[in-house]
Amino acid sequence: MTPTAPSPLVWRDDGLPQSSLYGDVYFSSVDGLAETRAVFLAGCGLPERFAERRDFVVGELGFGSGLNIAALLDLWRREKPPGGRLHIFSIEAHPLSRDEAARILAHWPELGEAAQVLLDHWPGRARGFHRVDLPGFDAVLDLAVMDVVEALEAWDGLADAWFLDGFSPALNPAMWRDEVLAAVGARSAPGARAATFTVAGAVRRGLSAAGFEIAKRPGFGRKRERLEAWRPGVRPVAQRPETLAIIGGGIAGAALARAARAAGLEVTVIDDADAVAASGNPAALVTPALDAGGGPRAALYAQALSRAVTLYEAQPDAVLAREVLQLAAGERDPARFATVADQDLFEPGDMRTLEAEDTRARLETPTPALAMAGARVIAPAEVTAAWAGPVVRRRVAKAERDGEGWRLLDAAGEIIARADRLALAGGAAGADLLAEAPLRPVRGQASWTRGHGAPATAFGGYAIPTREGLLFGATHDRDDTQTNVRSEDHARNLATLAKGLPALAARLAGSTFEGRAAIRATTPDRLPLADLREDGVIVLTGLGSRGFCLAPLLAEHLVARLLDVPSPLPRQLSHLLKLTRFDSPVTRSRL
């Protein structure tokens, strides 16, 4: 069984769920909720310690049915301090299905809305990190579906409290080994508390070696004792920024605005253009870059796609089509598609291969394909308008320090905005605000027509539905920065369409096309720049043609970095996006 396979449940005669992997029950036969409240909540000094920080961080080993988290959410909503936000990080190598969790949580109807919000946003089973919104609770959950040590090493947070709730050390000793407890210690803030139901000697020694002081307490139910642990020290309280100015109103800037507002920041978005790059087209693809290697780059795109689709689906009228067919372009593609479809980075069924005859019925084209059920076509204008909010339509010529914050000026030296923090998200148009960033402009022209339609398809080019017809394209011309629409580029797009979908191209021959040309920013390794500069400025650019896939997750990562709270992005993936990876002095600025 792979780490992402669901853990089989055996329902005992007494109604308790038991893991067939470890032979242990998921909660006490006396009362699982009462045990959670006594062992983990009270054991970590909750709710009293909620008042210590505006952003309170709880880590958990063993997500299981979500019972501990539902109980935590119930307590948090009743006792949270004004303006407080709860960040939860949990690890589960063998995730349960939503239906299994619902059957378990039904034992405690008193958890009510706390259990329901968790079930309504139940995380998937794909390997990696899952960001889960918990609306109405001022809380967010990051679930790591992977090995416990791998997850702890990947997480960049520091917990104020730990729920150590793996299966019994006698039945699952790997969860309690010294390496795990040392990693827990390394991911604990000064003054952190940890609690567990076991007082096994190996656990006590491991926690002590990890820097915790420990004490036995009276146990719950049939257990005579339980364990509480704490780290010495007091976590310093850093001054939190309250305002953020974002230069750039395309998908990068809009995603940053959404993430920042969700975190409680006041946001000003500034852009001198009415529509930015591909954000101004009537439709946009949300697809990952396919990587048969299954390494960090593949994991980045898989996680980004999952998060982007979750957010687009929550936005009214944003989604135009669900599922995108990627057609094979060469003899090796079917085998590559099969490898991608087998990757555990995607949810079961999200990637599946199609034989040539399977696509003929849909597209009149007998070509093997990869059906990407998790991909989308969206209406970019609706998304960027909703996420960015009101946009200040002025051009920023200069930004300068204003005490601890920033002051943005136009060409005449007039102040456009002031803010505590600054974000650069202008794509190719904002490249002049970064010193020697390795950004290269690429011009792309898309074409569209009314009254024709087709399933969303990619084939080197692409053809996707709009609200009124079909969009197809696009050209890809490096170092061309002109945005005039060209008739010859409509012809090029039609020729590309003919290679992938010849029957559709034949029907469109002789039609009149509308179009739009925009300039994207790209990097030498075709991965974006998503980092904080040494001066604290957010940089999100170089998204290329995958902006609608990448921007939502990367924006949340950058806002988390800005506020010094846990990021939804694993460490090894964030390292792919650093400004310094090209050995270029991009941490200096012309601002």
UniProtKB/Swiss-Prot annotation:
The gene is mnmC. It holds the Pfam family DAO. This is tRNA 5-methylaminomethyl-2-thiouridine biosynthesis bifunctional protein MnmC. The keyword tRNA processing applies. Disulfide bonds: none annotated. Gene3D superfamilies: D-Amino Acid Oxidase, subunit A, domain 2, FAD/NAD(P)-binding domain, Vaccinia Virus protein VP39. Keywords: Cytoplasm, FAD, Flavoprotein, Methyltransferase, Multifunctional enzyme, Oxidoreductase, S-adenosyl-L-methionine, Transferase, tRNA processing. Its main location: cytoplasm. HAMAP family: MnmC. InterPro entries: FAD-dep_OxRdtase (IPR006076), FAD/NAD-bd_sf (IPR036188), MnmC-like_methylTransf (IPR008471), SAM-dependent_MTases_sf (IPR029063), tRNA_MAMT_biosynth_bifunc_MnmC (IPR023032), tRNA_MNMC2 (IPR047785). It catalyses: 5-aminomethyl-2-thiouridine(34) in tRNA + S-adenosyl-L-methionine = 5-methylaminomethyl-2-thiouridine(34) in tRNA + S-adenosyl-L-homocysteine + H(+). Its cofactor is FAD. It is found in: Cytoplasm. In the N-terminal section; belongs to the methyltransferase superfamily. tRNA (mnm(5)s(2)U34)-methyltransferase family. PANTHER family: SARCOSINE DEHYDROGENASE-RELATED, TRNA 5-METHYLAMINOMETHYL-2-THIOURIDINE BIOSYNTHESIS BIFUNCTIONAL PROTEIN MNMC. The keyword Transferase applies. It comes from Caulobacter vibrioides (strain ATCC 19089 / CIP 103742 / CB 15) (Caulobacter crescentus). Transmembrane segments: none annotated. Residues 1-232 are annotated as: tRNA (mnm(5)s(2)U34)-methyltransferase. Catalyzes the last two steps in the biosynthesis of 5-methylaminomethyl-2-thiouridine (mnm(5)s(2)U) at the wobble position (U34) in tRNA. Catalyzes the FAD-dependent demodification of cmnm(5)s(2)U34 to nm(5)s(2)U34, followed by the transfer of a methyl group from S-adenosyl-L-methionine to nm(5)s(2)U34, to form mnm(5)s(2)U34. Its EC number is 2.1.1.61, 1.5.-.-. One of its GO terms (molecular function) is oxidoreductase activity, acting on the CH-NH group of donors. GO terms for cellular component: cytoplasm. GO terms for biological process: methylation; tRNA wobble base modification.
